Amino acid sequence: SIQGTMAAGLTVCMLFGGMDVSQFSVAGLAGMFLGILYDAGCNDYVTLLLVMLLGVALGAVNAFLICNLKISPMIATMGMQFVLRGFCYIATNGAYVYLKSPVFDFIGNGKVFGAIPFCLIIMAVIYLILWYVMKYTKFGRNVYACGGNHKAAQLAGINVSFMRYKAHMISSLCAAIGGIIMTCQNTASMCNAGEGSDMDCIAAVTLGGLALAGGKGKMVGTLIGI
């Protein structure tokens, strides 16, 4: 469910014609931020909201590097990958923060009706929302148009830069949610969480039939690829 949740957001980014290899570092930092807020006594639900907002903000930073500083998406997100992972170690000195909250325990290890993992339900809801958005909304059509040809989309009146911001923010938001699930499953905030898994989501998305150049692919394909 961790990779599945993150791959859902990455699908939107790659359909746009972008790339994001920083997802697991975003997830790692989200987990560390969750641990820091929990250790500081912050309300559990406020903590979850702030962690997701952090994910959105990091996605905006990625888009800024690409759109405004004209850095290649691969290089920009790879740079963020190393910066964020380094920050995880610096901010905590490599220490773990153990979570003893029933809310976090239920997110990571709880089951609905005694059989269905709650984290699997989170993943399913995200896929349903993004499937609907990509198939039936103007935003979804614009993402496919941009993925097909950025210049043609710009000439058609689509704000390609703004669309890139949205795509990367969705990707990093899903990464942050994946980081929340990963941290809750481990029952601890760990600075090295997700290390070495940076290409897992990209592999799943491409196995699901999404074109690396963008513009072709479906959410269902990614789900199968997982």
Task: Identify the residue ranges that each predicted region occupies.
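Transmembrane helix-bundle core of multi-pass membrane transporters
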Residues: 69, 73-137, 163-166, 185-194
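Alpha-helical transmembrane segments within multi-pass membrane transporters and channels
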Residues: 42-81, 224-225
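Helix-loop-helix "hairpin" substructures at the membrane interface of multi-pass membrane proteins
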Residues: 43-51, 57-62, 112-189
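Single transmembrane alpha-helix segments in multi-pass membrane proteins
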Residues: 1-43, 64-71, 209-219
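Alpha-helical transmembrane segments of multipass membrane proteins
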Residues: 8-12, 33-37, 60-64, 86, ...
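Transmembrane alpha-helical core residues of multi-pass small-molecule transporters
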Residues: 30-31, 54, 80-84, 122, ...
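Transmembrane alpha-helical segments in multi-pass inner-membrane proteins
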Residues: 175, 185-226
